[in-house]
Amino acid sequence: KAQRLNQRPDLRVEDIRGNVDTRLQKLDDGNYEAIILAESGLKRLGLVERITHVIDRSIMIPAVGQGALGIECREDDAHVRQVLAHLNDSETFVTVTAERAMLRSLRAGCLAPVGAFGQVVDGKLQLQGVVLSGMGDQRVDAKAEIALAELSESEQANAANTLGQTIAEDLIRQGATELISEARDNA
């Protein structure tokens, strides 16, 4: 909401509740002129035909971990952990690790107006983060990258955590803590 209002303060943006089918039905019933849903979710549900426009990441940075799937299992079940290890996508793991480290370092929750996008390009982990006021009239951004080449998997995870913390520190220096507090107080 905050990112949309930051770009288009002339819009009336409302929250919408329910699962994807419920939200689409509300759109079809004329309750809304448009709705914004995660592209990855619509694709996963086989609803690609409902996508009419994809908002570029330069306009709206996704929520932390957007589009990534996680699998949980018992920590003490070595066999299941070994089976699941083959499902792990190392690039997704390292990007989500960085994004979550940023969110954790900001002490922000899932409802805070915070966006993050990590990607691996040419052996470097790039991370972009944004924090906005609840109404989107104030915004702070940060981006950085770190080389992953020739690092072990655990070293890559440590590097991703460090990158997320670095981005958070930059955002905090720019006033992110106050923006998050203001958004939390007005929620």
Regions found by a protein language model. Name each.
Residues 2-4, 8-187:
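Small-molecule-sensing regulatory modules
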